[in-house]
Design a protein with these regions (language model features):
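FIC/Doc superfamily catalytic core
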Residues: 1-184, 188-246
Length: 246
């Protein structure tokens, strides 16, 4: 169901501070960041660090916050189309640098590979669904063309104006997740880009809460319909969050 637009620009700074902390905390927590909400708030609003926090988690949180601000700046320029260059730059900023992943295979063999920041995947990636089946995302060979097609589809849809913003965000989220263009960080980038679409369309940004992680991941893994519902559900929740500030 289409939501009423809210003039988010006129909302007070305290709302945006609250949103920034909630978004950074929940989006990174879904991916395993261990910072508490209080530690996140202390870091992002007061530039202070809790002595018990892990350095990797702190750096990851700060990088996500930079990405959030990049996304907001890009969304504000409604004359500028979405580009793959921006998507890759967002990913490069999020990951900060290339890093090596070490794994032990079932037979005990050690293997490793490099995750590249801001570069489309060079290795196949997949997920085990709730039913135990393996779902293969787009291959590395297919990914560049699919991302070009996705970005063009979004820009064309905005130009044509025949689709609601929530529908557009939902379908973009679905198509992006099916591609999984990067070797790491796909979930965080997907949520940032959904919010880019919503914000540019005059809607409040959404937050997938970390305590809804299982429902979120099940929706991603279960069906086309459920994947499409995620931005709509998030929009409903964020509209409720905005009410105290209006």
């Amino acid at each position: 169901m289409e939501q009423k637009k809210i003039d988010v620009i006129t909302l007070p700074q305290e709302y945006f501070d609250d949103l920034m902390v909630r978004m950074a905390h929940h989006s990174t927590a879904i991916e395993g960041n261990t910072l508490t909400y209080g530690q996140t708030e202390l870091l992002l609003l007061f530039d202070k660090v809790d002595g018990n926090a892990k350095m990797q988690d702190l750096e990851e949180m700060k990088a996500h916050n930079v990405c959030l601000k990049m996304m907001q700046t890009e969304a504000a320029d409604k004359e500028r189309p979405l580009t793959e260059t921006f998507v890759r730059k967002l990913h490069e900023t999020l990951l900060r640098e290339d890093y090596t992943v070490y794994k032990t295979l079932k037979d005990g063999t050690q293997t490793s590979y490099v995750v590249h920041a801001g570069v489309y995947k060079t290795r196949p990636n997949s997920v085990i669904t709730a039913t135990g089946e393996r779902f293969e995302y787009a291959s590395p060979e297919e990914t560049p063309a699919l991302m070009t097609s996705l970005v063009k589809w979004y820009n064309d849809a905005v130009e044509e104006g025949n689709m609601s913003i929530l529908e557009l965000a939902s379908l973009f989220h679905y198509r992006y997740i099916r591609i999984h263009p990067f070797e790491d960080g796909n979930g965080r980038i997907a949520r940032l880009l959904v919010n880019f679409i919503l914000l540019r369309g005059g809607y409040p940004m959404i937050i997938v809460r970390s305590n809804d992680k299982d429902n979120y991941l099940n929706a991603l893994n279960s069906s086309d319909i459920n994947v499409g519902l995620i931005p709509s559900d998030g929009a409903n929740a964020e509209l409720e969050q905005i009410q105290p500030f209006t």
